[in-house]
A protein has these predicted regions:
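Second-shell loop/turn segments in exported
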Residues: 2, 34-41, 75-80, 97, ...
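Helix N-cap motif at beta-to-alpha junctions
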Residues: 42-45, 159-164
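Conserved alpha/beta enzyme-core scaffolds, especially Rossmann-like or related mixed alpha/beta domains
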Residues: 65-75, 147-149, 157
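Scaffold signal of the M16-like zinc-metallopeptidase fold and its non-catalytic homologs
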Residues: 2-5, 48-63, 80-151, 164-176
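M16/MPP (pitrilysin/insulinase) zinc-metallopeptidase core fold and M16-derived inactive scaffolds
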Residues: 1-55, 59-60, 64-71, 101-105, ...
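Residues in well-ordered beta-strands of folded domains
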Residues: 26, 37, 93, 112, ...
Length: 176
């Protein structure tokens, strides 16, 4: 995630890992869910993290330049050399090329595709590198608007926290 309405910084999660007392921060995607887990033993820090996460998930900026950086773009293979061949680059594109470079990953994805031909499990949740370059910025925006909404979310927490305060924060920042 590359910033939000309240936090228009380039990478709020990286900024928080350096400034937070968190004991855990991450984001993970599977075939039919995405999770944004975090933990902190400090109440003020927990609430700061909650604020950043809620805003980043439900009010993401999703600028086209961020899509090019994170998703895919075309660059010269040798920076500054316009005579070098063009190649696809991008954070997710490169991560998925690496993830799908093992025989086990390819076998698992191939089996899943055949076992689940008509469900979300048919697809690689991170994206097939051969198809990532077909994704447009507009398609990403439409997917985000359709799926990243509080009505499509489950909020879970545990620990010694005031549930009423937590509920009020969700109401004020995500469910309004």
């Amino acid at each position: 995630l590359c910033g939000s309405e309240k936090y228009p910084v380039r990478d709020p999660f990286f900024m928080m890992t350096r400034r937070s007392l968190n004991t855990f921060m991450n984001a993970m995607t599977s075939s039919d869910w995405t999770a944004y887990p975090f933990a902190s033993q400090n109440d003020k820090d927990f609430n700061n993290l909650l604020d950043v996460y809620l805003d980043a998930v439900f009010f993401s900026r999703l600028h086209e330049l961020d899509f090019a950086q994170e998703g895919h773009r075309i660059e010269f293979s040798e920076e500054g050399n316009p005579d070098s061949p063009l190649e696809y680059k991008g954070v997710v594109f490169n991560e998925m090329k690496g993830a799908m470079s093992s025989a086990v990953s390819q076998l698992w994805q191939g089996i899943s595709s055949y076992l689940f031909p008509t469900t979300t499990y048919h697809y690689n949740s991170g994206g097939d590198p051969a198809e990532i370059t077909d994704l447009s910025y507009e398609q990403l925006l439409n997917f985000y608007k359709t799926h990243y909404h509080p009505s499509n979310a489950i909020f879970m927490t545990f620990g010694d926290l005031d549930v009423t305060d937590f509920h009020n924060t969700l109401e004020e920042q995500a469910l309004k």
